[in-house]
């Protein structure tokens, strides 16, 4: 509707264009596909009565132009004023192709983190679920060949939610976040998995009991952390376990109509461990995601100083040492047959420490005399959380070094030495992830980031640096496996809930719960994935692109 025609240049003499009704004519030109300059020879545009043209039947509409147009924030805000307050789809970006998806951000946190003293104590409520696509609780356990909680407090009772219930409340904040339970881990070891898989009946019982346990506690999937299968028997057993879990998850999904449970695995970065225990092409068939633990390349178990998670090797490194890097490890999984879009690259938010044998020799490869002093809150020799590293860096006489070859920092003071990741190194790693085309990142573990803002740069500085660097990145989907879907999320495309289901052609708007800057426009049953202009987020209440401060769920994007 136009308010009002008497305010347009109805005579064609005021604005100097010689055209009657230039604004109404522009509206009709955009809506009905009749250009104003398409006139018969010898007829001037000023001779056309655009009021009559505007009332004429519409021309056949051409195919819509999906080319995005750049508009300024001021233009957008001006356009959104008025009665409808709905953004104009023609001004926005085209829909997301089916062969692309957003990167995954797996956020692990541990069940021993809440036992840390003082400001190190971490609770499920401390998680910022808007920074994660998947939350992984580590760890569950195996008791009597069944998946079980590792702590009675995890399950809760009639009087309290327990840890599981408290984690699930994040789905109320971010309905699209997936919550998985991890089982295994370094302390759990390999023996329980061997005992489970050496008997087919025992393994199948575990598989079906696991489904019941996950559904009972509202988990969205299971993360298998077998550290580590070694040898031909373990190699075959691990594939059997993953295959049986996947087949059971698929069958339960089809019979119950519930969303399919996700199946992931945490796997080593060591090329030796990969060769010894992992049939990569077979595992890739059944796993939704493969979380590569690209850290702990060096630590207190060695007698020389080395960095926890170097991206690249030193030029002077030996052939063996050059394989102990993030770059080599991730590409080794690809060489062995893992699809790049399924590989999730580990990002540590902690450091490994050493005690120098000689304070004057502090570079990579210097002699070490065991691990560094235990942290005040984590209490483990040879290990510091990022918020403990902040304390270390602020002590007098501490020297911070950026290793330009390995693309990571380290610091030393006296005989104490720490190699860690900071915002700069993590941004560099994510840039590398994007260049190579991997499927996303996983963080070990969010309870080790500065979740309280103790370091003075806000809460979760490392996790925020990671997610900020991922913005705009899309993962290309190339793998064609037996259980793949166009979106690569492991769900059944036939029974997947459809966002756009209005068969009368109504236009509706919906926020993208995983990305504040994006939203969906439904034209009947046709879905278009759109992006707001730079600096704005989608406001579902008003159906406009708005300032982040006006949208509660997106307040964390407000510039500081």
Predicted regions and their residues:
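Substrate-binding surface in catalytic domains of secreted glycosidases
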Residues: 3-10, 14, 19-21, 27, ...
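Conserved, mostly hydrophobic/aromatic
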Residues: 135, 181, 224, 245, ...
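Acidic glycine-/aspartate-rich tracts in secreted/extracellular proteins
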Residues: 3-6, 112, 140-143, 186-187, ...
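Extracellular mucin-like PTS segments
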Residues: 31-94, 483-493
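Glycan-recognition patch characteristic of GH18 chitinases/ENGases
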Residues: 2-30, 76, 85-214, 244, ...
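Glycan-binding loop/region signatures in secreted carbohydrate-active enzymes
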Residues: 10-16, 22-27, 87, 91-101, ...
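An active-site-proximal structural segment forming one wall of the substrate-binding cleft
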Residues: 200-222, 275-283
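Cysteine-rich, disulfide-bonded extracellular modules and peptides in secreted proteins
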Residues: 27-31, 475, 487-560
């Amino acid at each position: 509707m136009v308010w009002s025609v008497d305010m347009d240049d109805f005579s064609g003499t005021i604005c100097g264009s010689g055209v009657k009704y230039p604004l109404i004519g522009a509206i009709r030109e955009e809506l009905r596909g009749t250009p104003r300059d398409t006139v018969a020879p010898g007829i001037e545009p000023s001779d056309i009565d655009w009021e009559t043209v505007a009332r004429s039947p519409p021309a056949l509409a051409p195919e819509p132009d999906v080319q995005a147009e750049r508009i300024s924030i001021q233009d957008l805000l001006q356009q959104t004023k008025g009665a409808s307050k709905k953004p104009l789809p023609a001004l926005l970006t085209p829909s997301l192709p089916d062969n692309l998806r957003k990167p995954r951000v797996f956020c692990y946190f541990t069940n021993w983190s809440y036992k840390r003293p003082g400001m190190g104590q971490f609770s499920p409520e401390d998680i910022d679920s808007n920074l994660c696509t998947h939350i992984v609780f580590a760890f569950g356990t195996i008791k009597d060949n069944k998946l079980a909680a590792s702590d009675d407090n995890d399950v809760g009772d009639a009087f309290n939610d327990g840890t599981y219930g408290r984690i699930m409340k994040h789905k109320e904040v971010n309905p699209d976040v997936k919550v998985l339970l991890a089982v295994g881990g370094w302390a759990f070891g390999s023996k329980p998995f061997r005992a489970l898989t050496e008997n087919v009946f025992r393994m199948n019982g575990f598989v079906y009991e696991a489904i019941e346990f996950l559904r009972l506690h509202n988990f969205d999937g299971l993360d298998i952390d077998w550290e580590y299968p070694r040898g031909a028997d373990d190699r075959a057993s691990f594939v059997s376990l993953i295959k049986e879990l996947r087949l059971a998850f698929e069958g339960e999904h089809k019979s119950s109509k519930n969303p399919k449970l996700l199946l992931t695995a945490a796997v080593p970065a060591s090329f030796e461990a990969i060769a010894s225990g992992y049939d990569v092409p077979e595992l890739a068939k059944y796993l939704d995601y493969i979380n590569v633990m690209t850290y702990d390349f060096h630590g207190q178990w060695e007698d020389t100083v080395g960095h926890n998670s170097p991206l690249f090797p030193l030029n002077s490194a030996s052939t063996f040492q050059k394989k102990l890097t993030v770059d080599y490890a991730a590409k080794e999984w690809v060489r062995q047959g893992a699809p790049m879009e399924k590989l999730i690259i580990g990002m540590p938010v902690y450091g490994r420490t050493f005690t120098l044998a000689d304070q004057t020799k502090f570079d990579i490869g210097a002699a070490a005399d065991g691990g560094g002093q235990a942290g005040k809150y984590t209490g483990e020799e040879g290990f510091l959380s990022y918020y403990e590293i902040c304390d270390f860096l602020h002590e007098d006489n501490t020297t911070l070094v950026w290793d330009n070859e390995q693309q990571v920092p380290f610091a030393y003071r006296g005989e104490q030495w720490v190699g860690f990741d900071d915002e700069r190194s993590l941004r560099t790693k994510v840039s590398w992830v994007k260049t190579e085309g991997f499927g996303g990142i996983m963080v070990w573990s969010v309870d080790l980031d500065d979740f309280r803002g103790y370091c003075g740069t806000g809460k979760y500085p490392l996790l925020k640096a990671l997610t900020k660097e991922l913005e705009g990145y899309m993962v290309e989907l190339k793998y064609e496996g037996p259980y793949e879907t166009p979106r690569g999320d492991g769900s059944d495309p036939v029974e997947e809930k459809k966002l756009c289901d209005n068969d009368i052609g109504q236009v509706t708007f919906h926020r993208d719960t995983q990305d504040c800057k994006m939203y969906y426009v439904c034209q009947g049953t046709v879905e278009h994935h759109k992006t707001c202009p730079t600096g704005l987020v989608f406001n579902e209440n008003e159906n406009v692109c708005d300032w982040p401060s006006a949208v509660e769920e997106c307040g964390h994007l407000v510039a500081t």
